[in-house]
Regions:
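Short, compact, well-ordered microdomains
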Residues: 55-90
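Compact soluble domain cores
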Residues: 1-60
Length: 90
């Protein structure tokens, strides 16, 4: 699958970084899913909103369960950066 948008700079909160490191998980496959339209654990309406956001240049949010924790992947509207964070860190 081809990328649907640019990630920009890839950032992570310290909590997610520690979680990924502790469980030996590479974030790359999740980032690839995010930019190719596999938005993970979001409802159908949110997935449709993401496709609209990609077309119109709005924020894109995916949600993945990584080592039993929900992790959000958010790309800003201006595509300057994509951040991995826990929902409670938003």
């Amino acid at each position: 699958k081809r990328p649907l948008f640019q990630l920009g700079q890839i950032l992570s909160t310290p909590g997610v970084l520690e979680h990924l490191d502790h469980h030996g998980v590479n974030a790359q496959p999740f980032l690839e899913r995010h930019i190719t339209g596999d938005f993970g654990d979001v409802c159908a309406d949110d997935a449709k909103e993401n496709l609209f956001a990609i077309e119109q240049g709005f924020r894109v949010l995916s949600a993945y369960t990584i080592a039993e924790r929900k992790v959000w992947c958010i790309t800003e509207a201006d595509r300057s950066c994509t951040t991995l964070l826990f929902p409670e860190e938003y």
